[in-house]
UniProtKB/Swiss-Prot annotation:
Protein name: Adenylosuccinate synthetase
Name of encoding gene: purA
Assembly notes: Homodimer.
Residues reported to bind substrate: 306-312
Species assigned in the record: Psychromonas ingrahamii (strain DSM 17664 / CCUG 51855 / 37)
Enzyme type, top EC level: ligase
Catalytic residue positions: 14, 42
Length: 437
């Protein structure tokens, strides 16, 4: 029988999932996206060539791997076309191996207009969305007014539904946000131009994945964003609009949850966050917090968002937040990324508890953003190392203090570091346990 493996982020996103998915797909026949949209930014470096994917699963760069966009993904036709063209310009025949669920909600221009208008209206309380219409598209889905891929099979009915939903949103855009209305004819024309392509990619995802499972094929589920951005379990309201945790796999793809064999949690050797929201171990944001160790993490780690281009906020490893990720996702093993970024630091800190109001010590995080904001990190300090760990592919070849750091993280989290990444390239990795074996 094959193995069904989930790869997801355990922090606030940007953990290095794209590289790991690409690495593991040499043993996978299918790679499935199950949540999010083109707000994801998965960076892959293969033989020095960098590719950033936002919507299409990272497995597309492997020959013979079928890639699926599941019903839990909100799909921007415009973003999909751009990505297909970029891949085809590089000689990757993406259309031949890409499939989509007809249950995918569509992201259309009025979603992007709403996203921008709302962030502007929030002023300094802005959530820090990517501005790509993700939240408003999920909102329409839950309100049952969203248009989906399956609506494209009847363009006459689609046009009627589109007119209703555009009228609904234009009322808000014009009268509340005082911005320009979205033009119905332009949106309809845009959708008509891509409808045939989208329809040609449709498969029954639940049925095809179940058949693949019964044939003993390996299926990899590729998460986007990170656990602490989950709509239900993250630092609400500074979260994304989908379930980024392992529970989202079943609802976002139609794959039975009992068939998942292994959950690989991607975790950076330190912590980063893009945009607004609480961050207990934060050291550096380029504005108010300017700790030199945090600046080192951001500079050496090239911490700029793959989707937004924004500087990421940086901080120490937060084992308290990670404990929640372990609980939420039933993590089997970790992949530790960017260990090499810590090279050259004299000492490294690990947050092992939060001090809450009243001097109460906790080892699991609060539920609310307000609770996170009140948390004061309690640190354990370990020695750093001066030797290079960059590109090292054997655990024993790592600097001794780097080995000790990895082992200490395993002790604190209770989860083995099955994979360790020491550089951006596919080859700069040590796989101690392969989830597909």
């Amino acid at each position: 029988m094959g193995n069904n493996v989930v790869v997801l982020g355990t922090q606030w996103g940007d953990e290095g999932k794209g590289k790991v998915v690409d690495l593991l797909t040499d043993k996978a026949q299918w790679v499935v996206r199950y949540q999010g949209g083109h707000n994801a930014g998965h960076t892959l470096v293969i033989d020095g060539e960098k590719t950033v994917l936002h919507l299409i699963p990272s497995g597309i760069l492997r020959d013979n791997v079928k890639c699926v966009i599941g019903n839990g993904v909100v799909l921007s036709p415009e973003a999909l076309l751009e990505e297909l063209k970029m891949l085809e310009d590089r000689g990757v025949p993406a259309k031949e191996r890409l499939h989509i669920s007809e249950g995918c909600p569509l992201i259309l221009p009025y979603h992007i207009a709403l996203d921008a208008a709302r962030e502007l209206a929030r002023g300094d309380k802005a959530i820090g969305t990517t501005g790509r219409g993700i939240g408003p598209a999920y909102e329409d889905k839950v309100a049952r007014r969203g248009l989906r891929v399956d609506d494209l099979f009847n363009m006459e009915t689609f046009a009627v539904k589109l007119k209703e939903v555009i009228d609904y949103h234009n009322f808000q855009l014009v009268n509340y946000y005082k911005v320009e209305a979205v033009n119905f004819d332009e949106v309809l024309k845009q959708v008509q131009s891509v409808a045939d392509l989208l329809i040609s990619l449709v498969i029954d995802v639940t049925d095809e994945l179940d058949k693949a499972r019964l044939r003993g094929e390996n299926i990899l589920f590729e998460g986007a964003q990170g656990t602490l951005l989950d709509i239900d379990h993250g630092t609400y309201p500074y979260v994304t609009s989908s379930n980024t945790t392992a529970g989202g796999v079943a609802t976002g793809s139609g794959f039975g949850p009992a068939h998942i064999d292994y959950v690989l949690g991607i975790v950076k050797a330190y912590t980063t966050r893009v945009g607004s929201g609480p961050f207990p171990t934060e050291l550096y944001d380029g504005v108010d917090k300017l700790d030199p160790a945090g600046k080192h993490l951001g500079t050496v780690g090239h911490e700029f968002g793959a989707t937004t281009g924004r500087l990421r906020r940086t901080g120490w490893f937060d084992a308290v937040a990670i404990k929640r990720a372990v609980q939420l996702n039933s993590i089997t093993g970790f992949c530790l990324t960017k260990l090499d970024v810590l090279d050259g630091l004299e000492e490294i800190k690990i947050c092992t508890a939060y001090k809450m109001p009243g001097d109460k010590l906790v080892d699991v995080p609060p539920m609310s953003a307000e609770g996170y904001e009140q948390a004061v990190p309690v640190y354990e300090t370990v020695p750093g190392w001066t030797e290079s760990s960059f590109g090292v592919t054997s655990f024993d070849a790592l600097p001794k203090n780097a080995q000790a750091y990895v082992r200490r993280l395993e002790e604190i989290t209770g989860i083995p570091m099955d994979i360790i990444s020491t550089g951006p390239d596919r080859n700069e990795t040590m796989i101690q346990v392969n989830p597909f074996n």
